């Protein structure tokens, strides 16, 4: 495996996934070589005047992996531990995810190495605007359309789209997605990824067990994805018995009441504490206990590589639905399938966010809007159809995992586009 940049375990695992998919699909090796490296990598150094008057520089990236299917599309994360190698892996996953969803997008990802919790609101705004200026030459409605990711949100997108609009001298709503409803956004975006995870779980449960009603679920992570996955799983009839974040686990055998998720803006430890108090149960301080609970469905919805070979034997769920990007290592996934546990891969399960971004982009390009109910209906239809296609492919190939079926389906669409263009 030839690379000219610093690698990480996450990037290596992603490349192995792509390589396996190319081989399973019977596609030529030069296709893998075309996907092995991004089309373009931008590294930026962003100056921010801090509240103490000093200038501090923050390193950032924008990785544009492949645009055979259309403009680059992918989020921007602000996190103190981001690396260029991991950003490349995430851009590759976006290429696969966008292809699998049938969207007219290629894959990209952006990042800034910063802990946004340590910035004041003014500092965060200056950093967001600085990043938008730094990447402006490479983005646009038909070039590259960023969105939020870990550590960023709709307010950060609002600052970025405002800064970009200033630079080009016109309102440019379609350049960034997941904006606030007050600034060309759509209210469904707040919960779209978590909603999509719940839809994926429901559709697979329907095919495995006849339905999701009454099935028990545990959700690891109470960020935007996890909190809304828990909420919508309950609304679809599952019994959410446990939720967790880095501070611990809240568990109640007869099921948790997670209705407050829709009403509260609380995040992280505050949300975990609120759920604990509302349900009258204590927080168990070991967050890893979430993986060993006896449940039907486990939703890892926090960060990558949390289900690993050193803890996978403790996983008791029968269905793992990946809300996060890359939460299950390849070795752990093999062990799960050997035990009959099905894993719904990230590029299928958590595509609700980018599908919603596509719907918002279409609205912005045409200066029209759909109401919340119509938007959610369109999102649900696309997610359900994607699950049906991948599940049918997986059923035909008995030796494959569902990830194999998803990756092959995504790669075939990319390959056909590249071949038609004359790139291969």
From Swiss-Prot:
The record marks 149 as: Important for catalysis. Optimum temperature is 80 degrees Celsius for oxidative deamination. Retains full activity after incubation for 10 minutes at temperatures up to 105 degrees Celsius. InterPro entries: Aminoacid_DH-like_N_sf, Glu/Leu/Phe/Val/Trp_DH, Glu/Leu/Phe/Val/Trp_DH_C, Glu/Leu/Phe/Val/Trp_DH_dimer, Glu_DH, NAD(P)-bd_dom_sf, NAD_bind_Glu_DH. Gene3D superfamilies: Leucine Dehydrogenase, chain A, domain 1 (3.40.50.10860), NAD(P)-binding Rossmann-like Domain (3.40.50.720). The keyword Ribonucleoprotein does not apply. The active site is at 109 (proton donor). Substrate binds at residues 73, 97, 357. It comes from Pyrobaculum calidifontis (strain DSM 21063 / JCM 11548 / VA1). One of its GO terms (molecular function) is NADH binding. Optimum pH is 10.5 for oxidative deamination, and 9.5 for reductive amination. Retains more than 80% of its activity after incubation for 30 minutes at pH 4.0-10.5. NAD(+) binds at residues 193, 224. Is not regulated allosterically. It comes from the Archaea. This is NAD(+)-dependent glutamate dehydrogenase. Catalyzes the reversible oxidative deamination of L-glutamate to 2-oxoglutarate and ammonia, thereby playing a key role at the intersection of the carbon and nitrogen metabolic pathways. Is strictly specific for NAD(+)/NADH as the acceptor/donor, since it cannot use NADP(+)/NADPH. May function in vivo in the catabolic direction. Also catalyzes at low rates the oxidative deamination of L-norvaline, L-2-aminobutyrate, L-valine and L-isoleucine, and the reductive amination of 2-oxovalerate and 2-oxobutyrate. Induction: Is constitutively expressed. Keywords: NAD, Oxidoreductase. It catalyses: L-glutamate + NAD(+) + H2O = 2-oxoglutarate + NH4(+) + NADH + H(+).
